[in-house]
Swiss-Prot record:
Name used for this protein in its record: UPF0060 membrane protein Ajs_2087
Membrane-spanning segments: 7-27, 33-53, 63-83, 86-106
Localization, UniProt: Cell inner membrane
Keyword Signal attributed: no
One Gene Ontology cellular component annotation held by this UniProt entry: plasma membrane
Protein family (similarity comment): Belongs to the UPF0060 family.
Alphabetized UniProt keyword annotations: Cell inner membrane, Cell membrane, Membrane, Transmembrane, Transmembrane helix
Pfam families: UPF0060
Superkingdom field: Bacteria
Membrane topology: Multi-pass membrane protein
InterPro entries from the UniProt entry: UPF0060
Length: 110
């Protein structure tokens, strides 16, 4: 899979997972409607389905996806929660994305 398509798929997967977890959080922590559990379940089902679209071995996909998840979660922190990440947050994301790139795009023998 091309690097751009892989990254786009990772981004969609991360957003689906975060939305699927954020909606129950709104229900449990902020007293929002229990009806939020319906789109949350759909979002988590989408998340699981998106994971099946990655062509690499599942362990490698989960490891590489974790790096993208960290980056998307930090952007979520900023845009949805209104908390601006600091320099150490961004450094952590950079290190994580370097690891993700190595795992996802390193040449493989065989």
């Amino acid at each position: 899979m091309l690097p751009f398509k892989t990254l786009a798929l990772f981004l969609l997967t991360a957003v689906a997972e975060i939305v699927g977890c954020y909606l129950p959080w709104l229900w449990l922590r902020q007293g929002r409607s229990a009806w939020l559990l319906v789109p949350a379940a759909a979002s988590l089902a989408l998340f699981a389905w998106l994971l099946t679209l990655h062509p690499a071995a599942t362990g490698r996909v989960y490891a590489a996806y974790g790096g993208v998840y960290v980056a998307v979660a930090l952007v979520w922190l900023w845009t949805v929660d209104g908390v601006r990440p600091g320099p150490w947050d961004w450094l952590g994301v950079a290190v994580t994305l370097c690891g993700m790139a190595i795992i996802a795009f390193a040449p493989r023998g065989g």
